């Protein structure tokens, strides 16, 4: 069985998220939901965003958008997974306060235009997986 891409992500083996997952790293049926979420989020290219719902759909659970948020919220401190590339279905950052600003700054650093209120133009920046 393949070593989970997600586990390698957290060990720092896949620092370059700008490339999609190689063919041999495709998700396995046995992968847990969090593992599938990690793999999908890792594949979002720099300068693009996707929605919690899109990630859930790609993970095989189209009604699990909130669970995607929960998986990302529980990432360990210092995780290199690009969690900041996931926004709500309206193209808005769902976080508030300092967390909103942290996500906004990370996206701005990648060239994604984000309004002061956390709004992103999904037509321009949405990842077309």
Swiss-Prot record:
The record marks 52 as: Required for phosphate rotation/nucleotide flipping. The record marks 66 as: Arg finger, required for nucleotide flipping. Keywords: DNA damage, DNA-binding. GO terms for biological process: DNA repair. It comes from the Bacteria. GO terms for molecular function: catalytic activity; damaged DNA binding. The keyword DNA-binding applies. Pfam families: DNA_binding_1. Belongs to the MGMT family. ATL subfamily. Does not have alkyltransferase activity. A tryptophan residue replaces the cysteine at the known active site of MGMT. Involved in DNA damage recognition. Binds DNA containing O(6)-methylguanine and larger O(6)-alkylguanine adducts, and to double-stranded DNA that contains an AP (apurinic/apyrimidinic) site. Binds to the damaged base and flips the base out of the DNA duplex into an extrahelical conformation, which allows processing by repair proteins. Works in partnership with the nucleotide excision repair (NER) pathway to enhance the repair of the O(6)-alkylguanine adducts larger than the methyl adduct. Interacts with HelD and UvrA. This is DNA base-flipping protein. It comes from Escherichia coli (strain K12).
């Amino acid at each position: 069985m393949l070593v989970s891409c997600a586990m390698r992500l957290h060990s720092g083996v896949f620092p370059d998220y700008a490339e999609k997952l190689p063919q041999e790293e495709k998700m396995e049926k046995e992968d847990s939901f969090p593992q599938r979420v990690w793999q999908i989020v890792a594949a979002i290219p720099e300068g693009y965003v996707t929605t919690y719902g899109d990630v859930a759909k790609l993970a095989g659970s189209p009604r699990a958008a909130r669970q995607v948020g929960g998986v990302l919220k529980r990432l360990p401190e210092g995780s290199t997974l690009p969690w900041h590339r996931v926004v709500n279905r309206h193209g808005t950052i769902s976080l508030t306060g300092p967390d909103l600003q942290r996500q906004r700054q990370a996206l701005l650093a990648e060239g994604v235009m984000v309004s002061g209120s956390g709004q992103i133009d999904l037509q321009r920046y949405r990842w077309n997986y």
